[in-house]
Regions:
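Active-site phosphate-binding strand-loop segment of PLP-dependent enzymes
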Residues: 117-213, 219-221, 367
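Phosphate-binding glycine-rich loop
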Residues: 36, 40-87, 100-105, 111-113
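A glycine-/small-polar-enriched, mobile loop at the entrance of the PLP active site in fold-type I
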Residues: 11-16, 25-45
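Hydrophobic residues in well-ordered beta-strands that form the structural core
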Residues: 90, 111, 163-165, 335
Length: 391
């Protein structure tokens, strides 16, 4: 009789949330029993706690990460820092929602190719894309890897550009800054978290994120009071007081249950990150050296605090075959993302563009299991299977 092979899922959300199960249930019951399900104490507590964690003056919660991106841009439009038709530079290999948020508020996304060593926007290519219409750069901490660089901050300062962060995948990621090159007036001399490296940042708490809710949720962080006040109004129809609407806004609110869940998990910000870093080290120990050299981006791993490994991207020309082989052996994987935004049918005006690194990533990237629901034996087994297939 054959022994059944243990399945290794790409992500087991139930298992990830089990350590917090009692606290989460208690927090949800408290909300249910309160009779107050929107704009209550749980949301207020989360906004205050999250701003403190990120290090910003303001946090405005909303319904999801895509809304956070849109509200951030809508806020800048509302206070006059952006005008419709302005260009926003954005990485070509980002998730579709980043580009969608820009175009949906009548701004123009201008794509820049990625750097194959970091898988982030290539800061060497940005200035060639700047035109008189360029007013902002949107960096994306894709896969949980820091996208901010001193050069990007210098470009923003030189060309008087706003800097935005899509921090949907970057919770807990940080960098050590020692100069005043950030696009603000404040000198920097200590470590800062992503979400506080720019004029404003959008965050997602989709269940699979490193800080995940039990449904959709998002937020914007900023140190700009005028922007924060505009977003506070915009996310509730544009209302500035009962019955008075300054803007044509949207209805995008985080509910009390999601806030209660996030308040529990925000008490343990290191748990998921530590598990993922340990597993990355196991992959590095057990994957063959030549495979690591060929398939792991050269600057992906270190320094440790600059990557929280929301995704562990593995590059191989045999991506589809490896994915199938791992599936046959009970290992779940994902692809982030097989068709980049500029090749999507809803952007026909971009379909002719060429971004060779972004296209290579789209063709070769395979996301390997890496999260707190897995144990050491799981990671070692996945590594051995990869070695076996790519020998």
């Amino acid at each position: 009789m054959e022994t059944e092979v243990k399945k290794i899922p790409y992500l087991d959300l139930k298992a990830i949330n089990e350590p917090y199960e009692k606290e989460i249930k208690d927090a949800i019951n408290k909300v249910v029993n309160s009779g107050w399900y929107l704009q209550g104490e749980a949301v207020k507590k989360f906004e205050k706690s999250y701003a403190q964690f990120i290090g910003t003056e303001y946090c405005i919660s909303c319904a999801n990460g895509t809304d956070a991106l849109k509200l951030m841009l809508m806020g800048e439009l509302a206070i006059g820092n952006l005008q419709k038709g302005d260009e926003v530079i954005v990485p070509a290999n980002t998730y579709f929602a980043t580009v969608l948020a820009i175009s949906s508020v009548e701004l123009t996304p201008v794509l820049v190719d990625a750097n194959i060593d970091t898988l982030q926007i290539d800061d060497r290519l940005i200035e060639d894309k700047i035109s008189p219409k360029t007013k902002a750069i949107m960096i994306v901490h894709l896969y949980g890897k820091l996208a901010w660089t001193p050069k990007i901050a210098e470009i923003c300062k030189k060309h008087h550009l706003l800097l935005f962060e899509d921090n949907a995948q970057g919770f807990g990621c940080s960098t050590t800054l020692s100069d005043d090159s950030q696009n603000t007036s404040e000198p920097l001399s200590k470590r800062r978290y992503t979400g506080n490296l720019s004029d404003a940042a959008a965050h997602s708490f989709y269940p699979s994120k490193n800080l995940g809710a039990l449904g959709d949720a998002g937020a914007v962080t900023t140190n700009n009071k005028d922007l924060a006040e505009a977003i506070m109004a915009l996310h509730e129809y544009g209302k500035i007081e009962d019955g008075i609407f300054r803007y044509q806004g949207v209805n995008s609110r985080m509910d009390e249950i999601q806030a209660a869940v996030l308040n529990v998990k925000l008490q343990y910000p290191e748990n998921e990150q530590k598990a993922r870093h340990r597993q990355i080290q196991l992959y590095l120990e057990h994957l063959d050296d030549d495979i690591k050299d060929r398939c792991i981006a050269a600057k992906l791993i270190s320094p440790a605090h600059e990557n929280v490994f929301h995704v562990f991207p593995f590059l191989t020309r045999k991506r589809d075959q490896l994915k199938g082989f791992l599936a046959e052996n009970g290992v779940g994987t994902k692809i982030h993302y097989f068709r980049p935004p500029y090749l999507q049918p809803c952007y026909p005006e971009m379909n002719h563009l060429e971004f060779p690194v972004a296209k290579r990533i789209a063709d070769e990237e395979l996301s390997l299991p890496c999260n707190s629901s897995l144990n050491d034996e799981d990671i070692i087994r996945v590594s051995k299977l990869i070695n076996q297939f790519l020998v």
